[in-house]
């Protein structure tokens, strides 16, 4: 049997599938004939950047992927790490950027559903979700609509499916005005004897289709996700999938039950490219072929043709390879959970994907041509940094107005440091994200140890809901926990992709260390503009180089992730405007004892406040800072350089201090610098602080000391009873890289920052700080709603 070959496709038809003319020529060469419509669509989605990483794959080879705890690295549905005691953690991050731009609710909701399937396809029960979100200015009505829709979609799916959303980050910047980013990370605890892989095997083994029915929703979603957005993208709403979280909940339980029978040889969820991707990837990974009959596929719409079946991205669907003779056992399980389950195909020896329809062959393509031997572009890297970066690096603080202990003159008016602190706390990127968190069910499953916003990373207790075969003890260690975080400062990466990406890894590890967790491994989500433009490719290549170095330096191997390119929006003149390069790092860490962790809020009056890392007298530039962008409307300079030796020592000291019971609170200095970190500790603990700084006017600007970022800095508080042993430990392990800042006060104290000669730099009440910080987002949304 062979597929039929119609006449040539027009250049427009080829381009509509996301293929270049030279790629179409390569398809014809490989097939020895012209493809038919269904085959053209299959190549279009599988050769899209979203599926085959044709521009990024050469760069990803730099990433470290091996380590003593790595059980599954890149190439499977999710990475898996060994937590000890027989426990294994699956985790992964994925993007749903383009769908969320045109249909924010369903785009975000199905992003949650898709990443959950990646987790339970491995044989792991999902235990937590995090998200990393980017939007334009929150003053803009369109941004507010996208923001509210995305948050509603995430909360709807996560809440209904019963998986807690335990943390994340939200940034606002005009660079994302037309192209929001929605990255979702999921964690799962392995429940099966063996990790479920995706490579098909066993000639003659049946191929099962399970889950929901197939419709026309999500048609060509992978190709849609690999193109720039424009005003016409709203017409691509059919490319956005529609999810059913209640059906997914049943699918989770049915799949885990099925895996435990031992009857499943391999499994693959139907995400991007649907049936096309699942059949071709399973066949290619197993070195076999799959023959699938579309007439067996449960359809929710009539009159569907092979092209539609093969490219549909209808949600909550899976493909299994079962042991021959045990298929009915699996079908019965899925029927009991109210789900579809049919034998739709067979594993064959010939390494092809053969699609049958109405008694004929609808498509026949070598599996490797679709899933492994895909196009690869080794693009030329710019010989030197682009002009925008070189100009930005020329910035110096000399261009800023002079400042004193009283404040700084901005646009003809004097602003006190109180004014500037409150302005920064009111900035949506820095402000509390409680407007977001309160819409999420973050305590379902009852294993969330710290509520979102209460610490620098999420902490989840590892309490198996089902018996785990590999447990060394039948009585699980209920003190064992994991921490997780998602991080990226895109302004850093825009201004210096290499140094900025290193800083992303360092901050993620620092956030884990602030709750007492040992960083273990990374999953990354690379969100960039077009790699076909020299600047876009330079940003991508340099960021990958920085991520690779950061992960090697901090011994956090990469277990997999996602690449989302072509994040650009056509402006009114039709010129593509790219987002800031945004390599989001999702990192997980191990907590031996969840009774020994830290939040970021002060714990008791009289505790001593320390700054770990570079002392405030150290010269750190304001370049790339939130202060420079918000207060001076300037995006320039270089991000803080990362000293990995100092990072390792500071983070280890923080973790040991927490485990020994010396440290009572910990919070890293990030956006907004030490002043914002101090304010956040006051707000979280509802306790003030009195800080004394030694100001050397000839050496340091006041704003540099207060608002500069970087320096591997962590604020910790220690009870005075532990002060002597703690300082002895600090002296031994950090030398001079720490200082005492002051003491924790009470609520009435507020935040007071003084010079050693008693000049007041900052004196502001907790009530004022909390009002700005806690209501910044809600206030903007309410104002816009009232106006409209």
Swiss-Prot record:
Q: What class of enzyme is it?
A: ligase
**Transmembrane: is it a keyword of this entry?**
no
* Residues annotated for Mg(2+) 2 binding in this entry: 118, 269
Residues annotated for Mg(2+) 1 binding in this entry: 94, 562
Protein name per its UniProtKB record: Phosphoribosylformylglycinamidine synthase subunit PurL
Q: Which domain of life is it from?
A: Bacteria
Q: What does this protein do?
A: Part of the phosphoribosylformylglycinamidine synthase complex involved in the purines biosynthetic pathway. Catalyzes the ATP-dependent conversion of formylglycinamide ribonucleotide (FGAR) and glutamine to yield formylglycinamidine ribonucleotide (FGAM) and glutamate. The FGAM synthase complex is composed of three subunits. PurQ produces an ammonia molecule by converting glutamine to glutamate. PurL transfers the ammonia molecule to FGAR to form FGAM in an ATP-dependent manner.
Q: Where in the cell is it found?
A: Cytoplasm
Pathway note:
Purine metabolism; IMP biosynthesis via de novo pathway; 5-amino-1-(5-phospho-D-ribosyl)imidazole from N(2)-formyl-N(1)-(5-phospho-D-ribosyl)glycinamide: step 1/2
* GO terms for biological process, alphabetical: 'de novo' IMP biosynthetic process
**What would you give as a GO molecular function for this chain, any one?**
ATP binding
Chief location of this protein within or outside the cell: cytoplasm
Q: Corresponding gene?
A: purL
Detail which positions bind substrate: 95-98, 117, 241, 313-315, 564
The source organism is: Nostoc punctiforme (strain ATCC 29133 / PCC 73102)
Keywords assigned: ATP-binding, Cytoplasm, Ligase, Magnesium, Metal-binding, Nucleotide-binding, Purine biosynthesis
Q: Give binding positions for ATP.
A: 53, 92, 524, 561
